């Protein structure tokens, strides 16, 4: 599956999630299970067509995530800002989140 991570470089939670996903067991999980694609949404003014195409996962905050099947169907998408407080999530919590999706 493809994992879209929608975020922005100004976003502290996006930077925290990125760091967590690039180290330890989370990095191993993502490398094994997903093709990861980062989507820059700027100040909620970039790539909004991608956000719209997958049901507006950024509506409740960023970072947001969408998991797509090989035929581009949404398997999972954040809808309630599940990752919008990523800086307060433990590395284990982030790993478990992506392990569930």
Place the predicted regions along the sequence by residue.
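Solvent-exposed, acidic/flexible segments
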Residues: 4, 14, 23, 43-44, ...
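Hydrophobic heptad-repeat coiled-coil signature
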Residues: 11-17
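Short active-site neighborhood of thiol/selenol oxidoreductases, capturing the structured segment around
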Residues: 1-11
């Amino acid at each position: 599956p493809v994992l879209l991570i929608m975020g922005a470089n100004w976003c502290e939670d996006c930077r925290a999630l990125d760091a967590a996903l690039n180290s330890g067991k989370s990095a191993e999980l993502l490398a094994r299970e997903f093709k990861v694609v980062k989507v820059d949404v700027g100040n909620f003014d970039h790539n909004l067509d991608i956000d719209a195409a997958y049901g507006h996962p950024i509506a409740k905050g960023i970072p947001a995530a969408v998991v797509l099947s090989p035929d581009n169907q949404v398997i999972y998408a954040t809808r309630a800002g599940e990752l919008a407080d990523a800086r307060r999530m433990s590395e284990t919590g982030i790993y478990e989140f992506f392990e569930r999706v």
